């Protein structure tokens, strides 16, 4: 909601990214996403997963389906709010995914987006 308040003050060309890593835990998430949709301010939807335990708050994001985020529920909120743009995969994973061959990572991303998201 704070980001949306800022958007209102800065004008119609400013919006928000629904980044699941940063908002999945918020009990007011559904209301905030609905508000962003009413304002036409959802500009992006970033996906990954929250691993338990998390080894590093920045560089240990999980592949979709490996953690605890209810990705289908959040995607439904985003789509119910009127955003049907692409989901942007954001896997910051210094000790896991960044060490794997790119072709392998892309294959897993494709499979997970189709089956988990």
Predicted feature locations:
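Histidine-acidic metal/acid-base catalytic patches
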Residues: 1-18, 22-117
């Amino acid at each position: 909601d704070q980001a949306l308040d800022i958007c209102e003050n800065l004008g119609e060309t400013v919006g928000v990214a629904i980044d699941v890593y940063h908002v999945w835990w918020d009990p007011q998430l559904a209301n905030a996403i609905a508000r962003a949709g009413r304002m036409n301010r959802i500009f992006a939807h970033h996906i990954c997963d929250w691993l338990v335990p998390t080894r590093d708050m920045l560089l240990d994001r999980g592949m979709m389906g490996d953690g605890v985020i209810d990705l289908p529920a959040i995607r439904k909120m985003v789509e119910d709010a009127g955003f049907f743009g692409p989901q942007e995969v954001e896997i910051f994973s210094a000790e896991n995914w960044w060490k794997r061959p790119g072709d392998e990572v892309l294959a897993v991303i494709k499979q997970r987006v189709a089956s988990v998201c």
